């Protein structure tokens, strides 16, 4: 895959996690296939996109979100963008804290080697959520999630959100490994939209 294609798909993976977070906070549910793919990316150590995400189908939610971000922004997508920017900032802080980074890497390796459940199983999600809470959750400013209180007060939903935020950090790391930078969006907007259109065509 060419460089811009890799960067676009990696950026879509960030927006996918934040879209799923927003879906959970707003409705208590999220797209199952994209959720599975994003959570699975946490325990996939490769920097090759085709190894982290098996197909474009794994990133449909993220690709759709990126198209909206680059097109006509809605009020809902603005929240998704804010979460994404917060994750990019949080990942930058994490990269400056080697102790915390080592702790997260070690715990993810343990989860990968010891987990008997599917990554989207409640037990696995709870472990990922606890890892996020005990590490990244302590960095300021914390990511504040907006949504319906009935869902945000549900333990399983909050665990799920934290697990997806961890997946979001993984997505940011993947995006940066592909040379992704926020200013690229300004100069490559048309190319990215054309690329998204071609990806959508492949999915039909």
From Swiss-Prot:
<keyword id="KW-0472">Membrane</keyword>
<dbReference type="InterPro" id="IPR035932">
    <property type="entry name" value="HflD-like_sf"/>
</dbReference>
<comment type="similarity">
    <text>Belongs to the HflD family.</text>
</comment>
<dbReference type="GO" id="GO:0005737">
    <property type="term" value="C:cytoplasm"/>
</dbReference>
<keyword id="KW-0963">Cytoplasm</keyword>
<protein>
    <recommendedName>
        <fullName>High frequency lysogenization protein HflD homolog</fullName>
    </recommendedName>
</protein>
<dbReference type="GO" id="GO:0005886">
    <property type="term" value="C:plasma membrane"/>
</dbReference>
<keyword id="KW-0997">Cell inner membrane</keyword>
<keyword id="KW-1003">Cell membrane</keyword>
<dbReference type="Pfam" id="PF04356">
    <property type="entry name" value="DUF489"/>
</dbReference>
<dbReference type="InterPro" id="IPR007451">
    <property type="entry name" value="HflD"/>
</dbReference>
């Amino acid at each position: 895959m060419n460089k811009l294609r890799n960067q676009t798909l990696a950026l879509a993976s960030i927006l996918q996690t934040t879209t799923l977070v927003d879906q959970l906070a707003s409705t208590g549910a999220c797209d199952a296939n994209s959720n599975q793919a994003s959570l699975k990316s946490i325990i996939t150590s490769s920097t090759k996109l085709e190894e982290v995400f098996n197909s474009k189908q794994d990133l449909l939610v993220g690709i759709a979100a990126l198209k909206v971000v680059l097109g006509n922004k809605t009020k809902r997508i603005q929240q998704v963008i804010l979460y994404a920017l917060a994750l990019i900032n949080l990942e930058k802080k994490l990269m400056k804290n080697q102790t915390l980074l080592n702790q997260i890497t070690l715990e993810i390796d343990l989860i990968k080697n010891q987990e008997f459940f599917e990554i989207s199983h409640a037990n696995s999600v709870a472990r990922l959520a606890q890892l996020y809470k005990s590490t990244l959750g302590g960095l300021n400013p914390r990511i504040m999630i907006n949504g319906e209180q009935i869902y945000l007060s549900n333990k399983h939903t909050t665990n799920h959100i934290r697990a997806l935020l961890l997946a979001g950090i993984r997505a940011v790391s993947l995006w940066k490994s592909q040379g992704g930078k926020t200013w690229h969006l300004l100069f490559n907007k048309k190319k990215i939209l054309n690329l998204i259109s071609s990806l959508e065509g492949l999915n039909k």
